[in-house]
Amino acid sequence: LVGSEMCIRDRLTVEQKDAIIAACGEIIDGKHHDQFPVDMIQGGAGTTTNMNANEVIANRALELMGHERGEYQYCSPNDHVNCSQSTNDAYPTAIHIGMYFKHLQLLPHLEELIASFRKKGEEFSRIIKMGRTQLEDAVPMTLGQTFNGFASILQDEIAHLNEAAVDFLVVNMGATAIGTGICAEPGYAEKCIAALREITGWNIRLSSDLVGATSDTSCLVGYASAMKRVCVKMNKICNDLRLLASGPRCGLGEFNLPAMQPGSSIMPGKVNPVIPEVMNQIAYKVMGNELCVTMAGEAAQMELNAMEPVMAQCCFESVDLLINGFDTLRIRCVDGIVANEDRCREEVHHSIGVVTALNPVIGYKNSTKIAKEALETGVSVYQLVLDHGILTKEELDTILSPENMIK
């Protein structure tokens, strides 16, 4: 619309302008989408996609003007539809706007997953279990603290995603071929930014250096990296879910994951943690996409990065994967987790890790002796302290109460 209005005085007729605007409106309304067959991964820095759009718009405009498709002397995809713009500003600007929109779509799904973990944290807040470091018994904690921990580490990532997404609001529209603005009408860039702000309601800004912005794709690198950060934490969480739910008889078995399907074609009754496994694999894919984005991002040469199409494809795909993954993990796993409270308390009762609470009272050396003897004999720490007359039963009950050891 801005291009049409600014070019009308000597490069477009009113009839051409109105037809182009009408054709664009139809595409926005969902029509003619079958006329966009090109793959997102393409050579030419997005020229294929840009000209696909220009040609569809031009041909539809021709029909609205009463002409045949291809009669470009009446409405040209290059001279008229592409007036005042280039692939090298229109394409990346569209990517920026699309990615910011996808970012806004992603956040609620992550927030809902975080809320689900918080809900389980509250539900399990009074269930005592054993904490572990390096897979070895450490000190008691609550199962609720485990799930609140999951929620907290994911909550931190929302700020990182928001910070990375802000860069999408800086665009190079009006830069045309390499950032010099050649072939664009005077004032075109500023009017475009004003129109984009009005249409989106976002604080879209024109880059302060259009030459630099035209070759720079670091906003995609940054957002792909932010998504990778989320996936690193999602992998830790899903690995913990699988390990803590292992069993049912010979594993940790602190809680049960909802059963989704028979786990084996040969072992009756086996149930696998398929939903955390799905999220793990989604995370691997998103992390792989981030590597692709990084490699393509460093491929910029001179005044343009011809590899931006695959960067965009990876980022859009990663957002969609995460949205589906977050929802699947929340609905089909986290919401249905059931704690095995007796099993959790049994672990604490038989653990040697509770001896850590004795350090301030009997010292590290004596505590170590008790721990070693408990490990060698199978006798509980509680009983050994009583047998050696180190503390009274009343003193022990106070010190070794799991509830008192949880801060």
Give the label of every model feature segment.
Residues L1-I8:
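Short, small-residue-biased leader/transition segments that mark boundaries at the very start
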Residues R11-A19:
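Alpha/propeptide regions of enzymes that mature by internal proteolysis
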Residues K17, A23-E26:
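Internal maturation/activation junctions in enzymes
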Residues I28-A45, N162-A175, T398-L400:
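Extended amphipathic alpha-helical scaffolds
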Residues T48-T87, Q105-G121, V139-V293:
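Internal glycine-rich alpha/beta core junctions
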Residues E71-K102, L106-E123, S318, G325-D342, ...:
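Mobile "lid/hinge" segments at catalytic clefts and subdomain interfaces of large enzymes
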Residues G121, I127-M130:
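Intrinsically disordered, low-complexity linker/loop segments enriched in Gly/Pro
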Residues E157, S208, G212-D216, L220, ...:
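Catalytic-core signal marking the mid-to-C-terminal active-site face
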